[in-house]
Amino acid sequence: MLQQRVTVIGAGLAGSEAAWQLAKRGIQVDLYEMRPVRQTPAHHTDQFAELVCSNSLRANGLQNAVGVLKEEMRTLDSLILKAADTASVPAGGALAVDRHEFAGFITEKLKNHENVTVHNEELKEIPEGIVIVATGPLTSPDLSASLKAFTGEDYLYFYDAAAPILDGDTIDRDKVYLKSRYDKGEAAYLNCPMTEEEFDVFYEELIKAEVVPLKEFEKEIYFEGCMPFEVMAERGKKTLLFGPMKPVGLEDPKTGKRPYAVVQLRQDNSAGTLYNLVGFQTHLKWGEQKRIIRLIPGLENADIVRYGVMHRNTFINSPSLLKPTYQARTRDTLFFAGQMTGVEGYVESAASGLLAGINAAKMIAGEELVVLPRETMLGSMAHYITTADGKHFQPMNANFGLVPSLEDAPKKMKKQERYERYANRALETIQQYKDL
């Protein structure tokens, strides 16, 4: 018989949620949190689930994917959502919280739970037994070394360098063409051709665009590999024309001529509903990203489902390493949760902890572990991070581009109606799992 205790490493959003899901099912939890014994550069308190950036958990309405995700989590008795609803402050259509009340609620619930033993110490290695690793983007160097030994050198990353991801339905297919450079292999990229005049306008706007200021502990990330395309642009037009926007081998089949510049879009999920901009990792402010991207032919009305980011982040190559149950492929008793798995955002991190906690509990009970349907946001997130292209894997937030298309839906359906149908389908589906 399996042991009746689970070790949860990290009391952030994911670890706190995982610990709650285990404890409420009668399972003993050893919850390890190194703060305040060892602080991170971003944390300021010893409370669990401290929100280190914004106090907003984003949109609350069901016309947004993250709003649907929240409702699914409420259905499954999420501690994080219980805390957020209790500590909410006025924020229009968003769910924002008093961050101290929010973290205090979670800390009190876990510290006072009879099935939770809190250890304020740093774990430097992955222990034996059933373990959930939820140490977040600022995982300590010693534990990072242990993770690297487990995952392998090439499967642990220390920063995000992600290009924006677009909703494929909002790309103007009349202005782009499908082609791979020099026609090698199958035609795998959508290409957005630019004239010299279009490129000049794009370039001038790009070099004027505002960037997000880097935090002190993030200053080194540009030197580790991927350079933001706005930094390339500062080196001159030709840096882009010989870099991510080079047109060689990409003649436009409509004209037979080579464009002056080309922006390539790579399919980002197996369903072909999402596309990322190749080589466009960026640190521009989000409003600027939208403005600049919409200067590209074919993308004038493109919806960005995930903005480009560059920031400090410890995460694993989940497509290579994880099952959709959040278990490691090579060790069934080891689970991962939170931003470390490649989910992006407060709510998404907590959601992964919720499923990891439920599945660790099912393992102890000798029950079949749960993989939620892709029609749910919880299921679609788990599916994405474990089936995405491992060679180009970058963290992802909740969006409707991850869920299966609607059956029998008219092609010209309005976006809001489509989203409403996605939401209704997700919430009907999650009801079947409310007694997990």
UniProtKB/Swiss-Prot annotation:
Keywords: Cytoplasm, FAD, Flavoprotein, Methyltransferase, NAD, NADP, Transferase, tRNA processing. InterPro entries: FAD/NAD-bd_sf, MnmG-rel, MnmG-rel_CS, MnmG_N, TrmFO. It comes from the Bacteria. GO terms for cellular component: cytosol. It is an enzyme of class 2 (transferase). Its EC number is 2.1.1.74. Pfam families: GIDA. GO terms for molecular function: flavin adenine dinucleotide binding; tRNA (uracil(54)-C5)-methyltransferase activity, 5,10-methylenetetrahydrofolate-dependent. The keyword Repeat does not apply. Gene3D superfamilies: FAD/NAD(P)-binding domain. It is found in: Cytoplasm. One of its GO terms (biological process) is tRNA methylation. Signal peptide: none annotated. It catalyses: uridine(54) in tRNA + (6R)-5,10-methylene-5,6,7,8-tetrahydrofolate + NADH + H(+) = 5-methyluridine(54) in tRNA + (6S)-5,6,7,8-tetrahydrofolate + NAD(+); uridine(54) in tRNA + (6R)-5,10-methylene-5,6,7,8-tetrahydrofolate + NADPH + H(+) = 5-methyluridine(54) in tRNA + (6S)-5,6,7,8-tetrahydrofolate + NADP(+). PROSITE patterns: GIDA_2 (PS01281). Its cofactor is FAD. FAD binds at G10, A11, G12, L13, A14, G15. Catalyzes the folate-dependent formation of 5-methyl-uridine at position 54 (M-5-U54) in all tRNAs. Belongs to the MnmG family. TrmFO subfamily. This is Methylenetetrahydrofolate--tRNA-(uracil-5-)-methyltransferase TrmFO. It comes from Exiguobacterium sp. (strain ATCC BAA-1283 / AT1b). The lineage of its organism: Bacteria, Bacillati, Bacillota, Bacilli, Bacillales. The gene is trmFO.
